[in-house]
Amino acid sequence: MLRIPGKSLGYHEDISLTPWQAILASVIVLLGLKVATILYTAFYNVFLHPLRRFPGPVTWIAAPWMKSISHIRGQQDHQIVKLHQKLGHIIRVGPDTLSFTEMSAWRDIYGTGHAELPKHIYKGSGMEERPNIITAHSRDHHRFRKAMTPALTPEAITHEEALIKGYVDMLIEHLHKFAKSSDPYVNVSQWYTMTTFDIFGDLCYGESFNSLATGKQHLWLKSMSSMKVLVPLLVFPYISWLLVWWLLSPEQQRSLSDHQKRSYELTMKRIANRDTHPRHDFMTFMLRNRGEDQGVTDHELASNSDIVISAGSETTSTALTGITFFLCSNPDAMARCAKEVREAFKSDDEITFKATAELPFMLACIEETLRMYPPVPTSLIRRTLPGRPTLIAGELIPENTIVGVHHLATYRSERNFFDAKAFRPERWLAETRNDPKSPFKDDRLDAVRPFSYGPRNCIGRNLAYHEMRLILAKLLWHFDLKLKPGYEDWGFKQRTFQLWEKPKLVVEFKERQFQV
């Protein structure tokens, strides 16, 4: 029996509580304190916080978990686009988070004109324990980038052209078989992913995953689908493991676990064969300083190889799928692009990395797709430095604020582009930019940074462009393409989980009729 002095509570007699009553009373008091803390925090965030002058949704500011739920549902990026359209180029999307669509914010957040703003990693998510070029702090990032850069120089990429063309030709062979069959409909999303995945696997590990050879998706691709669902869960510090257990199926959890083991085993196999490997690939360059102070460890090799393959193959295949959708949805652009390709090349053998870089309208179509459907539609967030405010887009931003330029919102902003929601590749042509009467003359083309900006921009940018140009040119040279009915809204109703959900896109392939 617990006895509480009654006088302390205004009673004449002492109060006696059983153990269970005491426990219940303690729970009620603790819950009351927790509710009071939540209410005070919400009030502070909305009315007293240093960021209170920036507009934003009250629900996300007062209760950040509401934003996290939107993220898990795959709707957060679409809501941010709408919020920017309504509230302006700087909005508050969390208690300590600002989103930007102003072009100058690229330089201010990601550029080199100041001390580097550190990447924001959610503590307790486990991401800080994975040493790779995306999550690494500044010093390790420089070390990883130094190890990878030689593999992605123009000379190194040219050296790999024959290998890449071999996989692209294998894709074309498969598509010819579909075009000649009674069912000429192809899920291009799947086949593009298998192609880029095989390419990056060979470039990284020196061996193919054989997705194109077998016509079947490798287990790695299935694990990538699970990882897309996993990413939003990482914003819940310290309980992400519990959410993974609760929300992911046993098969998805097993797939993620197997993926980590598979990546490490492939890396160790490639290291073991380093002296007998017949050609230079990514790993050849990364192994040069292995184990040295400025080199990379075996664990870091495995982690970075995983990132190179997963991020490189997924983003490139996403862009290719988007290009196919927008061209098929815009017959005039498709006809002009196909005409340009077919007039430029008399035979398939003439289609090379160098030659495809000289097709202005096709390049414009690629750039416009990256604007309309950026492979990474969200923000790559940073945190402002402690101890002083940071000037971003003309505004002094308080210390320790999470900031980022939101790709999708920036690219679809009417402040930045005329007819921003429409696929208009002509906006990228030199003659359009130089025409004072063009409605696109004031477009802020430099606001489009699908490969990010500054010292942490995508290291594989040039390789990605080579792949996209080569694959698109060969497709348009060999085939006439048409969307299967029912896929007209494919590009506008997708969920996002840092990357696009990217459901299947089915296209009819018809062999090109050559003029005799």
From Swiss-Prot:
It is a multi-pass membrane protein. Disruption phenotype: Leads to the accumulation of intermediary metabolites destruxin B, destruxin B2 and desmethyl-B. GO terms for molecular function: heme binding; iron ion binding; monooxygenase activity; oxidoreductase activity, acting on paired donors, with incorporation or reduction of molecular oxygen. Glycans are attached at N187. Keywords: Glycoprotein, Heme, Iron, Membrane, Metal-binding, Monooxygenase, Oxidoreductase, Transmembrane, Transmembrane helix. The chain crosses the membrane at residues 23-43, 229-249. The keyword Transmembrane helix applies. Heme binds at C458. Its main location: membrane. It comes from the Eukaryota. Its cofactor is heme. The keyword Coiled coil does not apply. InterPro entries: Cyt_P450, Cyt_P450_CS, Cyt_P450_E_grp-I, Cyt_P450_sf, Cytochrome_P450_monoxygenase. CDD domains: CYP60B-like (cd11058). Pfam families: p450. Signal peptide: none annotated. It is found in: Membrane. GO terms for cellular component: membrane. Belongs to the cytochrome P450 family. Cytochrome P450 monooxygenase; part of the gene cluster that mediates the biosynthesis of destruxins, insecticidal cyclic hexadepsipeptides which induce flaccid paralysis and visceral muscle contraction in insects through targeting the calcium channels and vacuolar-type ATPases. The aldo-keto reductase dtxS3 converts alpha-ketoisocaproic acid from deaminated leucine into alpha-hydroxyisocaproic acid (HIC), which is the first substrate for destruxin assembly by dtxS1. This is Cytochrome P450 monooxygenase dtxS2. It comes from Metarhizium robertsii (strain ARSEF 23 / ATCC MYA-3075) (Metarhizium anisopliae (strain ARSEF 23)). The gene is dtxS2.
